[in-house]
Amino acid sequence: MSVQTGVPGAGEVRLAEGLRVGFLHVPMSQEAAKLMLGLPKGSLEEATLQLFARAGFPVAKSSRSYRPSFDDPALDGRFIRAQEVARYVEHGFFDCGLTGQDWVQENNADVVQVCELVYSRASAQKSRWVLCVPEASPVKTAQDLAGKRVATELVETTRRWFKAQGVECEVEFSWGATEVKVPELADAIVDITETGSSIKANKLRIVAQLMETTTVLVANKAAWANPAKRAKIEQIVLMLQGALAAQHMVGLKFNLPKAKLEKVAAALPALRNPTVSPLSNPEWIAVETIIDARQAREFIPTLKAAGAEGIVEYPINKLVY
């Protein structure tokens, strides 16, 4: 979007078609009437709904419906398994969608990877696809699995990985509950883990890591080339990234004797680039900053001991850098 201002008749406002800024609105063409989103059904579903709500795009969905509703008239979408999203984005059924990097790679999907969104079902970190065997297995390396059977949902990626290791083995598709297939139904498995707890619970041992993966937003190439759709995708990305950046942050504001600011800043390295404002008492200042929420319990007592008053901690919904 570019905005030019000036005297009436000398300036103009240009908006990507279909966007609204303040009271200005340019209707979308029929071609770009709705941005069709592919949302992940299954393990990522609840985390995705929460993220969209924090980003300002609440998604309403009944328990039996795969057709979500949005309060933004420019959006439409469907819930579908994350394994399939990239394929449908490539083929143009969805303009964009959220899926895992692993499934983009598995499907060899020809899509635009717009951004990473580092969140998952249970944590705010990347997941890993790992090669596992039973704790008592004699297997120590991938080479020890030559001629053996490996079960996984990520078949093509696993086959390519073993080929790169120079190992010939049988890779078979698993419909789920992959951890229980060793040792009776398979010699090893390739499975995804966030924390490693399920691997330990099933008495498995990691032999190697195939890849790291996280959620990504991908776009159809034609949709990305459409100015109106691209602008809407970029708006969604900005807000999603802002919500993710803010999830472990809080705002902190307090009043402080001006003479103590340098000392307080030195004692609290994370208190960098704070906003400092004058107060009616020239000897005092108001300080406002953003910190990691997990540091607040250490910061606030330190600030109080340094003479700070009126300390307020408040939640942050979005943080846009």
Give the residues covered by each predicted segment.
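Acidic, glycine- and histidine-enriched catalytic cores of nucleic acid- and nucleotide-handling enzymes
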Residues: 133
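Small-molecule-sensing regulatory modules
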Residues: 16-75, 79, 99-115, 119-128, ...
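Residue-identity detector for glycine
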Residues: 6-11, 18, 22
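Short, structured active-site "lid" loops
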Residues: 76-93
